[in-house]
């Protein structure tokens, strides 16, 4: 799996297939049992704590439900990384925070608390925080989950726009196929920890791979069966009961 600089790449697949685990491997939260993960030429699991800390400063992360600090204002949420990881004066931090919030359309909401935000607004604040330090790599864990159609479209457009503006690389872990295919350059489909298909958005839409076709078009039955596996078929079970009766 390769994530080229300047590209937006989606990782798709059923729950539990290894999508979020991939993000955790990239971020150094987990170590691979075999193989290696390289970010900017560095093998992540070989870095010491200081090296990993420096590498993580160059990464941004948007968690599934934003994960904003609930006791901090919108402004302080976005300023948090700047205060923790830089020696910038507060006047410059203020300018940068308002710039990031302006980029996601929420400069006017800088004094609000997370509890005063809608789900879509909270996700946009979290996105502003994720790009606060102009990262080279931005990771998104289910960025579209639980959003209304308008907010979903806004987040998708922001992911694409901010990636292009920063010249960064973005990894989008998602189940939202149709929205993702509008913004990504490449897609990896994962099943049981393995890549089973990959290609451009157009390749994926027209894939003949049964699993990919079922996932993309939301078909109720296919390789992923509607029925949970049982020892006996329903017909055999009924016949067995009838024979006993």
Where are these regions (language model features)?
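Catalytic Walker B motif of ABC-type/P-loop ATPase nucleotide-binding domains
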Residues: 138-141
